[in-house]
Amino acid sequence: MRIAFMGTPPFAVPTLAALHTAGHDIAAVYSQPPRPAQRGKKLQKSPVQLWAEEHGLPVRTPKSLKSDEAQAEFAALDLDVAVVAAYGLILPQAVLDAPREGCLNVHGSILPRWRGAAPVQRAILAGDAETGVTIMQMDAGLDTGAMRLIETTPVARKSAGLLTHELAEMGALMMRRVLSELHAFPPVPQPDEGVTYAAKIDKSEARLDFLVSAVQVERQVRAFNPAPGAFFELEGERYKVLAAEVVHPAETVAGAAPGVTIDDRLAIACNPGAIRVTRIQRAGKPAMEAGEMLRGRGIAKGTRLA
């Protein structure tokens, strides 16, 4: 099939790679424009753009697809289908309508649950038992299009990073399967029941809130790993918590105030219960096991964390 691929972050790369390996005619790869790196002013290309250029695929990086010129260039590609995976730009109706089979999206949730920008993180925060990938026929709404294929996977105690990687690989195989026999996967409208929205993660959410249950705090840690990174502060220094576990109730100290350490091994009282930090990163330092850090920078029982 003659395809345009549209994607930007690492999540999108496995799908592009799968389409390339399958021998599809990739007429163009669309990705968001290079942006300044976090440190310094040098522009950094997206993972999708880098992969496409390494494999000799033509790349386009418009800031928007709203102009008549951009839409005419897209229509001139004469596509069978466009495949979209975390592109990050709104597709106008003229773009959605241009390919003969429309635009197919790889979405990291079991639609209609968690429509929107952060489905993986929101599924973890909500304590969902499972999540998955939906191959969706795109329309003008926010992840409201008809569904062609859904597959699921347990959330378990996976971090957002690990789960995103798993869903990216799953979605790539699913999209390859759908495109190999498109009309065997007819679009099915999403149900009206069970709709939830996965709002974009705000950095302010990453500060650990010890006033909630230990179970919820541990979910925060997993949901924000690797980014933006769950954290607490002590004496003006930020500590990023990369992994934690819920402490057995027998290990908690009755009456301990939320946010106060209940031993010298970085167990922290919550409301109720407690968590123990198992992997941590101090500002400007490499990540390490919590026990290793504590040997160099002890945090005594009864210390209040913010």
Swiss-Prot record:
HAMAP family: Formyl_trans. GO terms for cellular component: cytosol. The keyword Transcription regulation does not apply. (6S)-5,6,7,8-tetrahydrofolate binds at S109, I110, L111, P112. It catalyses: L-methionyl-tRNA(fMet) + (6R)-10-formyltetrahydrofolate = N-formyl-L-methionyl-tRNA(fMet) + (6S)-5,6,7,8-tetrahydrofolate + H(+). It comes from Sphingopyxis alaskensis (strain DSM 13593 / LMG 18877 / RB2256). Attaches a formyl group to the free amino group of methionyl-tRNA(fMet). The formyl group appears to play a dual role in the initiator identity of N-formylmethionyl-tRNA by promoting its recognition by IF2 and preventing the misappropriation of this tRNA by the elongation apparatus. It holds the Pfam family Formyl_trans_N. It is an enzyme of class 2 (transferase). Its EC number is 2.1.2.9. Belongs to the Fmt family. This is Methionyl-tRNA formyltransferase. The gene is fmt. Keywords: Protein biosynthesis, Transferase. InterPro entries: Fmt, Formyl_trans_C, Formyl_transf_N, Formyl_transf_N_sf, Formyl_transferase-like_C_sf, Met-tRNA-FMT_C, Met-tRNA-FMT_N. One of its GO terms (molecular function) is methionyl-tRNA formyltransferase activity. It comes from the Bacteria.
